[in-house]
Amino acid sequence: MSKKPVALIILDGFALRDEDKGNAVTHAKKPNFDRFWNEYPHATLQASGEAVGLPEGQMGNSEVGHLNIGAGRIVYQSLTRVNVAIREGEFEQNETLLAAVKHAKEKGTNLHLFGLLSDGGVHSHIEHLYALLRLAKSEGLEKVYIHGFLDGRDVAPQSAETYLKELNEKIEEYGVGEIATLSGRYYSMDRDKRWERVEKSYRAMVYGEGPSYTSAEECVKDSYDNGIYDEFVLPSVITKEDGSPVATIQDEDAVIFYNFRPDRAIQISNTFANEDFRSFDRGEKHPKHLHFVCLTHFSETVDGYVAFKPINLDNTLGEVLSQNNLKQLRIAETEKYPHVTFFMSGGREAEFPGETRILIDSPKVATYDLKPEMSAYEVTDALLAEIEGDKQDAILLNFANPDMVGHSGMLEPTVKAIETVDECLGKIVDAILAKGGTAIITADHGNADEVITLEGNPMTAHTTNPVPVIVTKQGLELREDGILGDLAPTMLTLLDVAQPKEMTGKTLIK
């Protein structure tokens, strides 16, 4: 029997903005998106700030977006949870954080703090590092070392000096902390199994290997002089006057990894925390008996303590589809596969009964502006086969291109990325319509809508602009005040499935 699938198609990083300058969305030729927008009911959704459980004005991101979409409700994010804990005095009483400090004190070893040095709020927030420094000081710990990952992606590409200046002021104010290594996030926060990058960061932190400098500022200046900006700064070692490293991570040290977003934290965490790690040779000096703390739950694969444990999300979209014996497909390429599976399932790694997953490998290129098409065509071919085979009742699809290429801050490659996705979108939606099905076309956050600032500088961060939503079914009217948490209830309405009470979002269909 022919299925009439309902598909949720997420154009990652594709938001709407009136200003044309630096806007790859308006510059791109996208006849299919425009056709669906003009022919079918459409509206915009809020995908940032309080609408997705973030602080007011905070840009959304893929993890947050997919959590909200899959949960069918506003999910209060780790950034908000940790901020509230700091504000209300709960952070300094967190038993897991205190246990790490106690371990270092009792063993007479060092406490290492590592994470992203910015206030981007996507993977980390520098205020959380400052809170950890205050905690260490209040507990009388003196040997505290910082391994800073430079951002330049969720914030301006050359902003490291600003954050280092502020960090050094805090170190002086609190009387605790010293920078031991610096590394661009390209190396320390890889998520695509490019272990040669992670290894460089690891060896800087453990072996003191890599370019050496007498200060963090000297490291950044030298990198800038060589045309290497924050995200791509080589893992580097800060040295004392005698040329030896300020500190390396050694046996029985304590580590607190203060990033809160899991996807780019897993690989480097496994490198330190897991005894059975085999992805590269860690060498004889690999620190044994580390007390390793993750700020949040990164993955079942990470053997570490968790300071802020997950909030259980019951009756997510995937679970409800499964309970109603509907076949569902999750499909994406590598870069967004965790988002359309793990995050969309509320932090659940396992498949639900009746769930199929298709992972298409992302291309092995240094940066995606070199191949803006990424693997969109391969994703499309795989999905068209599923649609033609009448295999699925519900389809959850992510196209990574607008976001991943948008992060380059380059207009032409991002335009090419959107034009590629538009071509694929046309084929997929037309195939769904031919089966009598319906597509919900939307996005999780902004990015490609501003890749060049009004001043003409590269813009590599996300935006707070609203995202589109199109429902390819005539005779409907959509609300204009929607949020990402309303998408799952909308999909359930189209599938004629009752919405569970845990889903507090509201269908967009009037």
From Swiss-Prot:
Q: Which domain of life is it from?
A: Bacteria
Q: Which residues does Mn(2+) 1 bind?
A: D403, H407, H462
The record's Gene Ontology cellular component field reads: cytosol
Pathway annotation from the record: Carbohydrate degradation; glycolysis; pyruvate from D-glyceraldehyde 3-phosphate: step 3/5
What GO biological process, any one, is recorded here?
sporulation resulting in formation of a cellular spore
Decide whether keyword Metal-binding is in the record.
yes
Catalytic reaction(s) noted: (2R)-2-phosphoglycerate = (2R)-3-phosphoglycerate
Q: Which cofactor does it need?
A: Mn(2+)
- Signal peptide segment: none
Top-tier EC class: isomerase
Q: Can you tell me which residues form the catalytic site? A: S62
What keywords are assigned to this protein? Glycolysis, Isomerase, Manganese, Metal-binding, Phosphoprotein, Sporulation
Q: Which GO molecular function entries does the Swiss-Prot or TrEMBL record give? A: manganese ion binding; phosphoglycerate mutase activity
Which sites bind Mn(2+) 2?
Answer: D12, S62, D444, H445
On assembly, the entry states: Monomer.
Stated role: Essential for rapid growth and for sporulation. Catalyzes the interconversion of 2-phosphoglycerate and 3-phosphoglycerate.
Q: Which family does it belong to?
A: Belongs to the BPG-independent phosphoglycerate mutase family.
Q: What is this protein called?
A: 2,3-bisphosphoglycerate-independent phosphoglycerate mutase
This protein's species is Priestia megaterium (strain ATCC 12872 / QMB1551) (Bacillus megaterium)
